[in-house]
Amino acid sequence: MEKIMPISPISGHMPLSQIQVPQHATTSPLLEQGNRLFEQSVRRGPLHFQSSSLKHLCAELRQLQNAPSSMQARRVQDAIQHWENHHPKEVMARSTRLAELKQALAEQGTVGRTLQSKVMATGPQVILKQPMPALPQSIAAQITKAQTGCTTTLVSSATAELIKHNQNNQQHIKDSDGRKPVNNMPPPPPPPMADKTQKVKKWVVNTDSKQLQALRYYSAQGYNLINTYLRGGEYVKHQAIETLLSRNYLHSNEPTPQEFDAGMRAYIQDVTEGLNELAITDHKKVYRGLKFDKSELKNLLDQYTTEGNIIAEKGFLSTSPDKAWVNDTILVINLESGHKGRILGDAAHFKGEAEMLFPPESKMLVEKVLNRDDKEFDSHFSNLRLTDDASADTTRIKRIINIKMLNE
């Protein structure tokens, strides 16, 4: 990575034309360590963490190194929490480096949030209206902030605007202060008035409904809590309370059991309604890879391998409209018009992942079970659409189950 030399603070009467616009902040060594850790994980394949979002985190980390951003830092933190919740053994083996990565995020991401709010409060337009004597100090202050290791796009943009403003208007400002023109040349005319018909850029405001925001949070990290709760599994109660408090579904950190259940139901209802807000699609088939070869999952395996059996999925059901992740069991789910599945698309937290999500209590009919030693297995296997991950071992697939999604 190209090393960026620090910019000297402005002092005395340094010509503003010599000031350089800060390009990138010096990268934290801890952040580089975290980047290398997850790059290694990518090379080992998505099955290392059982998460295709691993590649997205590496992209976020590279962007975060070049231009630290509070929003990107938050997405990286969400991804780390996702792995901590779902893959504790793998994470435990790398707890030291994850701790280092979190510290790096605290250094750059958290400081970024603090700095960004201050910069937006002043804003480049406010600074541009200051008289000439204050401009060098303003630029120096911005560059000093950049040298702390937290250059944001906003800071760079503001600094560039200040320099350009000074270069274009230096003569005009001097003339207005009663000083003589340089080299006996007349001062340039004042800058042209802005075209009032030109559209004014505004800050982007999140106009998503509360339900869509709940759905996006679910896709980031809330799915583990919700689905564990719906399926009657064990979850960490204080983490669940913190989640509900942060989403305004609880107003006390010591809720009664009734208050907690009411908060969870409201949260689940919002996610479901957010899902219903998405567009209906005409998909005819989706896929889902499952790992059933565990003794504790025998009862669940029996349900899925009994032809004619109707299964009611208590939690949200995540499927892929494109390809199935390789596992010991592949579900091929056939859909009819009017199904309740929705493609998350832009509503997903991690972009680029094709996912169709079905609401709780979706019912499925087991139509046909094909084991590897069945005669028809090979023909069905050749028609499967599987992930093209090089580390995927297709010999692990033991059964293909054809499912019909019931519109009830």
UniProtKB/Swiss-Prot annotation:
It holds the Pfam family ADPrib_exo_Tox. The active site is at 288, 318, 355. Its EC number is 2.4.2.31. Mono-ADP-ribosylates chicken skeletal alpha-actin and human non-skeletal beta- and gamma-actin. Mono-ADP-ribosylates 'Arg-177' of yeast actin, blocking its ability to polymerize. Does not possess NAD(+)-glycohydrolase activity, unlike most mART enzymes. Upon expression in S.cerevisiae almost completely inhibits growth. In the C-terminal section; belongs to the SpvB family. It catalyses: L-arginyl-[protein] + NAD(+) = N(omega)-(ADP-D-ribosyl)-L-arginyl-[protein] + nicotinamide + H(+). This is Photox toxin. The lineage of its organism: Bacteria, Pseudomonadati, Pseudomonadota, Gammaproteobacteria, Enterobacterales. Keywords: Glycosyltransferase, NAD, NADP, Nucleotide-binding, Nucleotidyltransferase, Toxin, Transferase, Virulence. GO terms for molecular function: NAD+-protein-arginine ADP-ribosyltransferase activity; nucleotide binding; nucleotidyltransferase activity; toxin activity. Residues 168-196 are annotated as: Disordered. It is an enzyme of class 2 (transferase). Residues 190-393 form the TR mART core domain. It comes from the Bacteria.
